[in-house]
C-alpha cells in the first residue's frame, strides 16, 4: 500500500506489516534519550524492572541540559544519578560539562540522530528530529526505561495530517512563524496523536534548521511526530554534522492516504506571536505591538541554533537593548557558541547590552537564568507559554521568532523588525 512518511519509517523498524493507522506495532529503536530531570526517573524504573544492562551503550544519550550548570543541591543530585548510571553502564553519549548543550540541538548536530531513525526520548520535544526525517517522539520515563533495557518500544501507528505551505515567503518570516500560524489554525489538540507531515514550495525552500524549529513544536498541536521529507538539503546537513552516508531522498508515497490536508499560503503574511497563555493564541505582531515587556529570551531547543543567532544579531547590530529589558541570549550548544564567537555575534550581543549565558534550557521551563517575577512579561523564542511556565503565575510569555524577540528587546515592547 502507499505509505505516509510516518508509516514508511515505522515499517523499517518493525517486523509487522504496517497496514493501517491505529495498528499497534513493536519497533526497534535507533536512539533512546533522557535528560537531568527525566533520566533519574527512567533509571529508577530500569533497575526496578530487574534490568541489569542497557541494550546498546552507543544508542543511549543522557544530556544534562535543563538545570545545568547545576543551580542547587537538588539539581546537582539529579545529575549525580545520571552520571553514575552512565559510568556503570559505560554509556558513550553522556553530556554534562563543556560538551553539553540543549539536547534537541545537540543530537542532530553531533550526528546521533538522522533520516529514517526511530528515536524515543523522555522529553516532549523529542519530535524535533522529524526536521531531518526521523520518526521521533516523547515518552514517559517507564517506556524509556524499557527502551534502554530492550532496544524496543511499542507504538500505535498515527494517522497523518498533511500540511502544504506555499506562496512567497516574506522577508521577516521564519519557520517559527509558520509553525505558530499552523498551531493557531488547528489548535493545541488539532493533531492529537497524529503525525504532521510538511510539504509545499515554502517547506522545500526552508533551511534544515528552520525545519527542525518547526518539528520541535509539533507537540504543541498534540502531535505524535512532525515530519519533513529527506531531500538534498537534509543530506547536505547530515554530511556536515557527522552523519555521512545519507545518499537517498525519502518521502511519502504518491497516493498515501491522509486523515486531513491543511493548505497554508504565506504570501503577504507578517510575523506573529503566540500570546498568553497558549501556543495557539496566535496574533500578528501588529495587533499586539506596544505591549510593554521586561525580558527577552533568545535560545532554547526551538530557536538556539546558529541561524537563529544570526537573525538576532542582524536586528541587534548597532542598536541597544531598552534599559527596562533584560535580554538573555543562550546559544544552544558549545558548537553554536563557538560559531557565534568566530562570526563576531557574541560581541554584537554584548555591545547591545544582552546577557549572554551558557547552553542551557534554563529559563524556558522556569528553571533558572531568567525567571519572571510577579506581573512581568517576556518575549521568548521558546515553545510554551502556559501560565507560570517561566516563573510567577501572574507573569506572561509571548512566543516569537528571534527576529521579533530581538526587535522587542530594542523597543521595550512587542515589536517586529520592520518597526526599527
Swiss-Prot record:
Binding site for [4Fe-4S] cluster: 301, 361, 364
Catalytic activity: (2R,3S)-3-isopropylmalate = (2S)-2-isopropylmalate
One GO molecular-function entry: 3-isopropylmalate dehydratase activity
HAMAP family found in the cross-reference section: LeuC_type2
InterPro entries in the record: Acnase/IPM_dHydase_lsu_aba_1/3, Acoase/IPM_deHydtase_lsu_aba, Aconitase_4Fe-4S_BS, Aconitase_4Fe-4S_dom, HAcnase/IPMdehydase_lsu_prok, Homoacnase/IPMdehydase_lsu, IPM_dehydratase_rel_enz, IPMI_cat
Cofactor: [4Fe-4S] cluster
Entry-linked CDD domains: IPMI
Keywords from the named record: 4Fe-4S, Amino-acid biosynthesis, Branched-chain amino acid biosynthesis, Iron, Iron-sulfur, Leucine biosynthesis, Lyase, Metal-binding
Gene from which the chain derives: leuC
BP terms from Gene Ontology: L-leucine biosynthetic process
Superkingdom of origin organism: Bacteria
Assembly description: Heterodimer of LeuC and LeuD.
Family statement drawn from the similarity comment of this UniProt entry: Belongs to the aconitase/IPM isomerase family. LeuC type 2 subfamily.
Enzyme class, broadest EC rank: lyase
PROSITE patterns documented for this protein: ACONITASE_1, ACONITASE_2
Protein name (record): 3-isopropylmalate dehydratase large subunit
Pathway involvement of the protein, from the record: Amino-acid biosynthesis; L-leucine biosynthesis; L-leucine from 3-methyl-2-oxobutanoate: step 2/4
EC code(s) of this entry: 4.2.1.33
Note on how the cofactor is bound: Binds 1 [4Fe-4S] cluster per subunit.
Database matches in SUPFAM superfamilies: Aconitase iron-sulfur domain
Biological function: Catalyzes the isomerization between 2-isopropylmalate and 3-isopropylmalate, via the formation of 2-isopropylmaleate.
Pfam families in alphabetical order: Aconitase
Amino acid at each position: 500500500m502507499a505509505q505516509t512518511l510516518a508509516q514508511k519509517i515505522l515499517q523499517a523498524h518493525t517486523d509487522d506489516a504496517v497496514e493501517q493507522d491505529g495498528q499497534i506495532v513493536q519497533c526497534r529503536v535507533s536512539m533512546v534519550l533522557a535528560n537531568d530531570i527525566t533520566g533519574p526517573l527512567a533509571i529508577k524504573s530500569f533497575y526496578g524492572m530487574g534490568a541489569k544492562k542497557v541494550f546498546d551503550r552507543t544508542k543511549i544519550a543522557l544530556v544534562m541540559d535543563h538545570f545545568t550548570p547545576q543551580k542547587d543541591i537538588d539539581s546537582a543530585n539529579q545529575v549525580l544519578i545520571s552520571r553514575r548510571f552512565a559510568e556503570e553502564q559505560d554509556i558513550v553519549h553522556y553530556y554534562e560539562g563543556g560538551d553539553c548543550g540543549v539536547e534537541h540541538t545537540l543530537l542532530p548536530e553531533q550526528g546521533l540522530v538522522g533520516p529514517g531513525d526511530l528515536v524515543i526520548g523522555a522529553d516532549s520535544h523529542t519530535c524535533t528530529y522529524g526536521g531531518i526525517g526521523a520518526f521521533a517522539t516523547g515518552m514517559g520515563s517507564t517506556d524509556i526505561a524499557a527502551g534502554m533495557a530492550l532496544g524496543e518500544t511499542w507504538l500505535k501507528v498515527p494517522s497523518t495530517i498533511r500540511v502544504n505551505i506555499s506562496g512567497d515567503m516574506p522577508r521577516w518570516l521564519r519557520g517559527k512563524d509558520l509553525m505558530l500560524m499552523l498551531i493557531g489554525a488547528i489548535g493545541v489538540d488539532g493533531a492529537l496523536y497524529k503525525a504532521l507531515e510538511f510539504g509545499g514550495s515554502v517547506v522545500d525552500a526552508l533551511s534544515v534548521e528552520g525545519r527542525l524549529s518547526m518539528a520541535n513544536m509539533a507537540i504543541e498541536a498534540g502531535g505524535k511526530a512532525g515530519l519533513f521529507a529527506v531531500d538534498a538539503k537534509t543530506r547536505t546537513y547530515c554530511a556536515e554534522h557527522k552523519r555521512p552516508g545519507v545518499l537517498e531522498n525519502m518521502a511519502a508515497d504518491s497516493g498515501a492516504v491522509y486523515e486531513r490536508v491543511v493548505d497554508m499560503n504565506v504570501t503577504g503574511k507578517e510575523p506573529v506571536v503566540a500570546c498568553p497563555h497558549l501556543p495557539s493564541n496566535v496574533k500578528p505582531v501588529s495587533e499586539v505591538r506596544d505591549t510593554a515587556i521586561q525580558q527577552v529570551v533568545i535560545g532554547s531547543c526551538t530557536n538556539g541554533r546558529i541561524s537563529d543567532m544570526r537573525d538576532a544579531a542582524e536586528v541587534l547590530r548597532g542598536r541597544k537593548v531598552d534599559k527596562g529589558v533584560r535580554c538573555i541570549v543562550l546559544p544552544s550548544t558549545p558548537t553554536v557558541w563557538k560559531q557565534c564567537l568566530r562570526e563576531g555575534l557574541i560581541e554584537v550581543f554584548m555591545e547591545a547590552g544582552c546577557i549572554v549565558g551558557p547552553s542551557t534550557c534554563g529559563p524556558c521551563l522556569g528553571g533558572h537564568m531568567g525567571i519572571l517575577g510577579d506581573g512581568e512579561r517576556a518575549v521568548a523564542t521558546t515553545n510554551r507559554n502556559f501560565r507560570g511556565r517561566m516563573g510567577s503565575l501572574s507573569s506572561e510569555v509571548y512566543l516569537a521568532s528571534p527576529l521579533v524577540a530581538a526587535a522587542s528587546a530594542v523597543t521595550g515592547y512587542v515589536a517586529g523588525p520592520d518597526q526599527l
